[in-house]
């Protein structure tokens, strides 16, 4: 994720479309502004943050907010392995391997359970402090545990429970819920594939998934898709 901007700019300058699963939520808008300029200069398309969250879940949140404009949405991830968080921990000096689990506490609040296998001679307290100060973890309750073998713990399953309670017009107590249990890398890859397809149908610039017409994610004749899905 931290290398997305650098590599995407190089590729966009060659006139080639890019899609990515950038997942540092607080930096998405600044990345979009940066890549929008590069994409337009290269006459190419960039679609960013196109995994399942951010990504397809963002589309669900947008739809729910449209049909219940007043209200609160809670996105509860997991329990499951976060690929982005796990990669971030592996990049820390002294870490041989790592697994970061996202545990839902409720109402959109999460706990991070991080399991680390250390390089020989690495100091656990130093590694723990580096993890807790990393942008991926600094805003969440984070627990770091040293284990002899991370591979013994690995499971690529993940999930999300997305709930919105709100108001449609003057009608209160509208409750919506979206729930899925998934194989994280498989779903992320599938989203990236359909977004790459959609990128071929957009004007030059940088987009997030909520800016892309959902029908553009699908292959097939537009009239047939409308007849089938509407």
Can you annotate each of these PLM segments?
Residues 20, 46-50, 76, 99-100:
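General beta-strand structural signal in soluble alpha/beta enzymes
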Residues 25-28, 49-57, 79-83, 185:
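Gly/Ser/Thr-rich loops at beta-strand to alpha-helix junctions
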Residues 33-36, 56-72, 90-98, 136, ...:
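Oxidoreductase and adenylate-handling cofactor-binding alpha/beta cores
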Residues 43-65, 192:
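Short alpha-helices
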Residues 80-197:
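C-terminal substrate-binding/catalytic lobe of Rossmann-fold NAD(P)-dependent oxidoreductases
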Residues 175-230:
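NAD(P)-dependent Rossmann-like dehydrogenase/reductase catalytic/cofactor-binding core
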